[in-house]
Design a protein with these regions (language model features):
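N-terminal beta1-alpha1 cap of cysteine-dependent amidohydrolase-like domains
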Residues: 1-387, 398-435
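Short FAD-binding loop at a beta-strand-to-alpha-helix junction that anchors the flavin cofactor
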Residues: 390-396
């Protein structure tokens, strides 16, 4: 196997297949890293070939470059951008548009210099400035003319863009008058980006509730008992447990779920977080002290979470994964139905284990509500506790469907419950991360 043509052909095939399968008019392909990095070279060579194969009139190369500010001399320097463009041109790619990443206005002189020495039209040098909110960037780039130069390069005749809805979103973000604190309990909290979709979904829900959302990061391995939970979680307005795999930190998550249930703090469990909710309920309400998941204790006596029956056997690990979009029926009178406002929904899944139906009736007899199931009623998709503002666990991943201007209904309901809880309780200060 060779880098060229085998790997580059595979990269191109992925791009072409995506365009064909989605019937897209335009495919946007981002090549990360820095020009000249060895890791990026096969990808850059592949997109160079795409331009030749599809015709340069059907391809627009946009190069994002850093324009650093030197405080000692109070000036922006264009040399790094010039060298980066020269490196890219040496690989056979001539940028059509150059986007200048800078903290402030670089000035017309810098833009003219980059235009001249990087061989692009002056109006194709676009500033991408540091903004108070990331969501202001589309408006900034539109005002700078990025849409016009891209459409011109691709010979696309498009109507004038209507960003009214986006402007309203920015206005809501700027005028938020409330703040709530959400504890995110997980095992990967040292790398916040591991929970990026969950973070953004919380922020989106905050926009709709006119509230800032501050995230209090909690490593589940530190939650050894209820005393530690009180230290870490006292004062938060809601607790969210996202997905994950493996047994590390599981006992701490169970402690957090117990604390949320006993203190009546809004709780949202996603995938593993739902399974944790079920395991805690089985231990502390049903009395099965050893209740667990067959993922962690394959030979356990009371595995309330188990591999689905039709997936048991000698199947490669990846083959047991339930992936993609599946329908779910919401039960009438539940928080799930209230949030969605309809009976049938569809959500994206990525899990291997499910609620063990051997314990279904017993769980329900002890108060746990099965609020969502597969259409045939066989698989439990969501559970909740009745009489709570929000104590919900879902087997699917709602964070994948949340958008800045269209918060996911479950996240929206969770933040609304957190704000209500905040009004009824004293708030304790944390050192959170803010959007």
């Amino acid at each position: 196997m060779q880098i060229i043509p085998h790997i580059t052909n595979e990269i191109k095939s992925y791009i072409y297949n995506l365009a064909k399968s989605t019937e897209a008019d335009v495919v946007i392909t981002e090549i990360g890293g820095t020009t000249g990095d060895i890791e990026s070279q096969p990808f850059l060579e592949a997109i160079r070939q795409v331009g030749i194969e599809q015709g340069m009139e059907n391809c627009c190369y946009i190069h994002v470059v850093l324009v650093p500010y030197i405080s000692g001399s109070d000036e922006y320097k264009s040399k790094p951008a010039q060298h980066s463009c020269k490196e890219l041109q040496g690989m056979g790619i001539a940028p059509n548009v150059i986007v200048l990443r800078a903290d402030g206005r670089v000035g017309s002189d810098i833009k003219r210099k980059i235009s001249m020495f990087c061989n692009v039209r002056p109006d194709c040098v676009i500033e991408n400035l540091t903004m108070p909110s990331l969501y202001e960037c589309p408006l900034m780039l539109e005002a700078a003319g990025l849409t016009n130069v891209v459409c011109r390069q691709l010979h696309l005749e498009t109507p004038a863009s209507d960003l009214t809805e986006w402007k309203e979103l920015i206005s809501r973000i700027a005028t938020r008058s409330k703040t709530c604190t959400i504890a995110l309990v997980g095992k990967y909290v040292k790398l916040h980006d591991a929970y990026l979709s969950v973070m953004e979904s919380l922020y989106h829900a905050g926009f709709e509730n006119e509230s800032k959302v501050e995230i209090h990061w909690v490593d589940s391995e530190n939650l050894l008992d209820q005393e530690r939970c009180a230290e870490e979680l006292s004062g938060v307005d809601g607790i969210i447990l996202p997905g994950g795999f493996g047994d590390r930190g599981i006992e701490g998550m169970i402690q957090a779920a117990r604390y949320a249930r006993e203190q009546n703090i809004p709780y949202f469990g996603i995938c593993l977080g739902m399974q944790i909710m079920v395991m805690e309920y089985a231990r502390d309400v049903l009395g099965y002290a050893d209740a667990n998941s067959s993922e962690f204790t394959p030979d356990g006596e009371h595995n309330v979470i188990a591999l689905m029956p039709d997936q048991q056997g000698n199947i490669p690990k990846g083959g047991t994964m339930r992936l993609g979009k599946y329908p779910c029926i919401t039960a009438e009178g539940t928080k799930l139905r209230e949030c969605y406002g309809k009976e049938e929904i569809d959500e994206r899944h990525r899990h291997r284990y499910e609620f063990n139906n051997d314990y279904r009736a017993e769980m329900q007899n002890h108060g746990l509500v099965i609020s969502g199931t597969s259409p045939d009623g066989r698989l439990v998709e969501a559970v909740e506790l009745p009489g709570r503002d929000f104590h919900v666990g879902v087997q699917f991943h709602p964070e994948f469907k949340s958008r800045p201007n269209r918060a996911h209904p479950l996240f929206k309901g969770f933040i609304a419950a957190a704000l209500k809880y905040q009004q009824e309780h004293t708030i304790t200060d944390h050192q959170p991360m803010t959007d």
